[in-house]
Amino acid sequence: SPRPPMPRETLAALRTGQLWDVLGVRLNGPKAEGKRIVLNWSFSDTGETFVLNLENCALTHVAGIQAAAADASFTLARSTLDEVIAKQTTFPEAVGAGKIKFTGNPMRLGELMDLMDEFPRMFEIVEPKRMAVT
């Protein structure tokens, strides 16, 4: 079954840089082999700007700049991104509602998201000691 979305309260507590770090951890390196994606992000409510860069099987971000040759650039409120991640809306719905503006090729974001792994939220931290059967 699909994993439930991250709660909106949890998302709101994360700084935007931390949110990009979460994405970086979820990146499936072998699937990203040979891919390069550059995305500009500008958040209208926080005034933050970021470049998200996929290169050499790693996803990195830099705050405070925009790449001149980005594949796509997105302008939105950080709260809108939280709504998308929390699955309260979809990226296309938010674009249609005028909450997300973009230039360039927005499909590059979809390509990036297709490279992400889903990890289980709940897992055994300590497992019971298994007795050898003789």
Predicted features and spans:
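Acidic, aliphatic-rich amphipathic alpha-helical segments
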Residues: 1-60, 109-134
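C-terminal interaction segments
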Residues: 1-6, 65-134
